[in-house]
Amino acid sequence: MVDLFEKNEINGMTLSNRFIRSATWEGMATAEGACTPPLIDLMGDLAAGGVGLIITGHTYIREDGQHSPRQLGIHQDTLIPGLQNLTRCVHEHASKIVLQLGFGGAYLSKSRLRRMSSQDFQDLTEAYGQAALRARKAGFDGVQIFAAHGFFLSQMLCPRYNDRSDDYGGKITNRARALLEVLDGIRNAVGRNYPVLVKINCRDFVENGLTLEDSILAASMLEKAGIDAIELSGGLLNNPNIMRSKMDPEDTKGYFLSEARTFREKIQVPLILVGGIRSYEVARELVEDEVVDYIAMSRPFIREPGLIKRWRAGDRREAACISCDNCFEPIKKGEGVSCLPLEPEATETFFPQLSETVPASPPYPPGTGYKISIGLEDWQSNYIPVIKIQMALNGQILERSPSFPLGTQDHQKVTQAITDLLEKRTNIN
């Protein structure tokens, strides 16, 4: 029987167990992207709670790559001292921490969209390398390249976004070029002995998105280029099932289990699976069956930072997280991520512009539908475009974020409705 608490290594980085805190948006940095005491406290609680590896929320590697307010930055040297306080705190609790490197792409909060030139790609590759070097100087045990969920490097992999006809577009060997160049740029900056991980979508789950087959091909290229571990996720930020709420019992075995099994047949480097895992027994089974090497979780650690310590002590009850997604509500007020009870009566901060309701399929009763709204969300007086999906029965809202299996008829109908509303919104603007 596999021991999930046995020490292991990723390119010389020794971990105390096989549990990883997946990158989570904390919303606790300063307006300039600097580390803060509350963020250090949060990471310290995670480390003290027994998780083997912490991956930070995605940081921005250049000032023009910031995605959201109070996002942690790694774009300049002046940020290093504050980050050193963070890594020191984590290491005092015998845990390890990896910094996730990101760039907003089409989700940028400060830049206008434009087609990138060859020089732009070179400059961005250099910025990733310099950011990784800052991370190493700050004491991080490694870095993770963020190439999932529709952000820049994910968009490059996705035919839906990437319609280029040059060396960076077309077949997957070209669409993966930017990601491979980023990996090479990081290696040139920090060397081969510094752990470099990547987070990618196993598939995008949208029409004309990244397929499982192409994702595996991209992963194979990363493996040959010397990536140290691959974390598997799925979906785009504007996809209704990127992060499900009110999970069904089957979801607790992992959203992307079947895709992970297919990956394992082709990929030899360590695989990390995130999404929907709440049970110690499921985690043990996945590692024991050699489907993946590591288990990553996000929301369960917001609810219960000491979850791994509890499991290690012998209390193997499932994670207490109910996946209500209310943990991200405080970020809108500038308070940072935290677990809160679900409060349907909370003050509304969403201002819809367009909406449409599509009927739900059986076994839902007649009159049940998915209300899709596109509008603006008030995040500390920063109005950000948001897609909101609610389940309704005869016009009455039942769930703020319904759950349905990826690839089903309902999933396809909702995805198409989102696409149609986005086109209408573009025409209005």
Regions found by a protein language model. Give the residues of each.
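Compositionally biased, intrinsically disordered low-complexity segments
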Residues: 13, 93, 361, 375-377, ...
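Negatively charged, low-complexity tracts enriched in Asp/Glu with abundant Ser/Thr
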Residues: 348-368
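Flavin-dependent oxidoreductase catalytic cores
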Residues: 1-349
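Mixed-charge, Lys/Arg-enriched low-complexity segments
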Residues: 392-429
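Generic structural motif
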Residues: 13, 104, 344, 377-379, ...
